[in-house]
């Protein structure tokens, strides 16, 4: 419903939604985006009453090294620590692998190393986005099938972007490949 650390007003809105959801028995269905920031996002979300965090990690070597200026090994350590910190706070964790589509296309070894290193972590869903909308249905199906076959015990979601009007086709391809969940917007 929101990203952590945006503003005090945003935190108040998250708190109001979380309180409503808890009163209706839907507390575990309210998710918010958090960051790998040493617990700052987790504290912000916890104060707002959010019980499910979608942690944003880097799904490509380019984003890891270029944006974070971290080695893949260091980023993996940071992600694992953030996951465990969230669980220690009583939160359920999903992991959003930003730029996953480019990771699979240009640095699949990076994606596999991240998933190998987190396969035993307490993550409910691994979210695989086509962040820049670069996929076509053929690559989507191939990349998604690869992950399902390599990691049969993990739950994968596909998150399409519609830059080139392929979001529906790519989502169908992810489902055909065996992905367990999809993210959609209905207008």
Explain the meaning of each model-derived region:
Residues 15-25, 42-51, 83-90, 116-122, ...:
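Acidic (Asp/Glu)-rich catalytic clusters
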Residues 93, 112-130:
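Conserved C-terminal portion of the radical SAM core fold
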Residues 1-21, 57-70, 98-103, 127-138, ...:
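Glycine-rich, proline-tolerant flexible connector loops at the mouths of alpha/beta enzymes
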Residues 1, 25-31, 51-54, 92-96, ...:
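Structural preference for beta-strand elements that scaffold enzyme active sites
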Residues 63, 83-89, 124-128, 157-158, ...:
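Short C-terminal domain-edge/linker segments immediately following a structured domain
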Residues 10-18, 41-46, 104-116, 136-148, ...:
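Distinct, well-ordered alpha-helical segments
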Residues 7, 24-94, 98-111:
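Active-site beta->alpha loop and helix N-cap motifs at the rims of alpha/beta catalytic domains
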Residues 132-135, 139-187:
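Catalytic alpha/beta core domains of metabolic enzymes, predominantly
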């Amino acid at each position: 419903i929101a990203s952590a650390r945006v503003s005090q007003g945003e935190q108040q809105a998250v708190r109001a939604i979380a309180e409503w959801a808890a009163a209706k028995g839907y507390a575990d269905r309210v998710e918010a985006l958090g960051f790998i920031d040493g617990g700052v996002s987790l504290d912000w979300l916890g104060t707002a009453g959010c019980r499910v965090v979608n942690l944003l990690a880097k799904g490509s070597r380019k984003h890891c090294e270029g944006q974070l200026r971290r080695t893949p090994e260091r980023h993996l350590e940071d992600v694992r620590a953030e996951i465990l910190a969230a669980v220690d706070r009583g939160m359920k964790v999903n992991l959003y692998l930003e730029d996953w589509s480019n990771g699979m296309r240009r640095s699949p070894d990076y994606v596999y190393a991240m998933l190998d290193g987190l396969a035993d972590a307490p993550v409910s869903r691994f979210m695989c986005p086509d962040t820049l909308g670069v996929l076509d249905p053929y690559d989507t199906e191939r990349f998604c099938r690869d992950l399902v076959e390599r990691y049969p015990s993990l739950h994968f979601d596909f998150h399409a972007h519609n830059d080139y009007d392929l979001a529906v086709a790519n989502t169908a391809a992810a489902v055909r490949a065996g992905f367990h969940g999809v993210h959609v917007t209905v207008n």
